[in-house]
């Protein structure tokens, strides 16, 4: 959940913290940790549908996706707006130039990294979409995740990697 804007100009770690400052990790420090889960291709498309349908009426619920591209038509019915969905194949040779896109396989599992709060909210999509969409976070074997604390990403010292810190590290790269 993004809580503040980043304006053009000099940025600080404190500004990055303000953007993603919600929550407390299991380690007792500020900020939700990042977690890694797996979604099927069909579920990735469902997340895109949620974004395309809900964001226009509730901007605070916007999902900011990286490595994905989709096209949608706002004149179509809710939760049926996305008509094209792709994943991006990016080269990390320094310039992060886009190589190509490829279609999403509905049955394949894709690794997704997100904040703990967002990950825990994914399984509410079925109820909130009146059963039209379903997103169930899974482990690498395709089994539903019941304990998100087991999916927390940690640095080499075992510390939780926080959402706000990931943003600060990204901003430092500029």
Positions of predicted regions on the chain:
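Catalytic centers of hydrolytic enzymes
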Residues: 1-174
């Amino acid at each position: 959940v993004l809580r503040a804007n980043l304006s053009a100009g000099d940025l600080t770690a404190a500004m990055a913290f303000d953007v993603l400052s919600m929550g407390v990790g299991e380690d007792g420090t500020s900020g939700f940790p990042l977690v890694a889960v797996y979604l099927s291709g069909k579920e990735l498309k469902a997340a895109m549908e949620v974004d395309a349908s809900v964001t226009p009426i509730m901007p605070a619920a916007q999902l900011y996706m990286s490595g994905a591209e989709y096209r949608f038509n706002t004149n179509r019915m809710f939760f049926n707006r996305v008509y094209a969905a792709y994943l991006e194949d990016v080269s990390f040779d320094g310039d992060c130039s886009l190589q190509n896109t490829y279609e999403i396989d509905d049955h394949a599992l894709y690794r997704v990294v997100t904040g703990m709060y967002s990950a825990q909210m994914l399984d509410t999509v079925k109820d909130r979409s009146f059963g039209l969409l379903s997103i169930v976070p899974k482990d690498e074997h395709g089994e539903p995740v019941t304990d998100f604390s087991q999916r927390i990403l940690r640095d080499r010292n075992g510390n939780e990697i926080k959402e706000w810190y990931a943003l600060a590290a990204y901003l430092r790269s500029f």
